[in-house]
Amino acid sequence: SGHVSSAYDIALMSRELMLHHPDIQTYTTIWMDSVRGGSFGLNNTNKLIRFYQGATGLKTGYTSQAGHCLSATARRGQMHLVAVVLGADSSAERFSACRTMLDYGFANFSLLSPQVGENRVPVRLGQEKTVRAVPGGDTNLLLEKGVKPQVKIELEESVPAPVSQGQALGTMTVYEGENILLQVPMVAEKS
C-alpha cells in the first residue's frame, strides 16, 4: 500500500539493468525451459520473446490495482529500446502496446555518434609537439531519423608539458538548431 512506480521509473530501472547487467538476457530471452531433470517446465510469460524480432526481455506483471504490465526490451543493431505499459486491461493489450512503441522507435529513431575527426592541441616544451584530443565520454545520441546535428569543438590553443592521459583539453558540443543535445569534455588520448 502506498508504493507506486511510474512507467518512467520502470523504464529507468529496466535501462540500468540492461546496461549494467547485460548477462540477464541469458535468462530473459529464454522462451521455454525445463528444470529438475525435465520434470518441471517453465514458459516465459513475455510473449514478445518468441514473436518480436530482437526481443531481449524483460518483465511482465499483473496485480488487480496495476492491471497487466510489461517492460519490454529489444535490440536491433546497436540500438536497444525499452517500452513500458502499465495498467493494460488485458495481457494481449500490453503486448500490442509495447510492440507498437518498439516498432515506432525502430522506424523513427537511430543511434548516432558524431564524427569528431582529428583534433590536436600543441604541447609547449613537450617531447611530442601535439596531443590528440578525443571525447571524454559517451557520444551516442538517440535521434529522430533525418536529424543532422552540428558539432562544435573548442580546444585550448596550447597546453604545457607534461600532459596526462584524460587531461581536459576542451569541449565538444552537439547541437540541433539552438538546442544543445550533448556536451562532453575533449581529453588527451594519451600522456
Where are the regions that the model predicts?
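Domain-terminus/edge residues, biased toward the C-terminal soluble/receptor-binding domains
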Residues: 2-191
